[in-house]
């Protein structure tokens, strides 16, 4: 049979589809559990004793713990996401130059505004992970804010390198107090001949 020939191929596949799956046999009692693995022995004892309700609750608790751990892991992945952006943004800030051009100014504004938006929406960014253990999201949220502040630091450094931050005394001349002289001399000097 060639693949391009028009045949009723479903008749060829029907016997394979009609087979029922084999019965699943649990052979886990034949093998010893790994060292330090206690959950299996508790579950197998409950199943053999006929206490299926307690084994179901053990499975449900374990499943809930695994779900919370997975949510916490995903929360930390979200917290580390700004850290992965730091090298790219640092290279972009370096490559845009220090002269006052539209591209370098827009890059610098992006480095200041985007982390500020992310910091203000930290609570909404972490709402999918609220089902984790109580109090375990605070370190992840703190790390997220810290990494966003590092991104803002790159933007502030770029502003300073471009000369847009008032860091010298000549930038503050309007608030400088003029020097008060104790003595003044007026008039032309007299020369004696």
UniProtKB/Swiss-Prot annotation:
Segments crossing the lipid bilayer: 91-111, 137-157
InterPro entries: TMEM85/Emc4 (IPR009445)
Recorded superkingdom: Eukaryota
GO biological process, alphabetically ordered: protein insertion into ER membrane
Membrane topology of this protein: Multi-pass membrane protein
Keyword terms: Endoplasmic reticulum, Membrane, Transmembrane, Transmembrane helix
Localisation: Endoplasmic reticulum membrane
A GO CC term attached to the entry: EMC complex
Presence of the UniProt keyword Endoplasmic reticulum in the record: yes
Family assignment from sequence similarity: Belongs to the EMC4 family.
PANTHER family: ER MEMBRANE PROTEIN COMPLEX SUBUNIT 4
Protein name per Swiss-Prot or TrEMBL: ER membrane protein complex subunit 4
Organism lineage string: Eukaryota, Fungi, Dikarya, Ascomycota, Taphrinomycotina
């Amino acid at each position: 049979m060639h693949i391009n020939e028009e045949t009723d191929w479903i008749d060829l596949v029907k016997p394979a589809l009609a087979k029922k799956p084999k019965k699943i046999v649990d052979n886990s009692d034949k093998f010893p559990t790994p060292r330090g693995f206690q959950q299996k022995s508790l579950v197998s004892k409950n199943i053999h004793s006929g206490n299926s309700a307690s084994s179901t609750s053990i499975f449900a608790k374990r499943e809930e713990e695994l779900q919370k751990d997975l949510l916490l892991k995903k929360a930390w992945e979200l917290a580390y996401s700004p850290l992965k952006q730091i090298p790219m943004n640092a290279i972009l800030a370096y490559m845009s130059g220090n002269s006052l051009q539209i591209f370098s100014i827009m890059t610098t504004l992006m480095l200041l505004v985007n982390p500020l938006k992310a910091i203000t929406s930290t609570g909404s960014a972490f709402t999918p992970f609220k089902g984790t253990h109580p109090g375990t999201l605070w370190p992840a949220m703190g790390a997220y804010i810290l990494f966003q502040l590092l991104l803002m630091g790159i933007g502030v450094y770029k502003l300073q390198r471009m000369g847009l931050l008032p860091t010298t005394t000549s930038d503050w001349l309007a608030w400088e107090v003029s020097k008060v002289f104790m003595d003044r001399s007026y008039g032309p000097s007299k020369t004696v001949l």
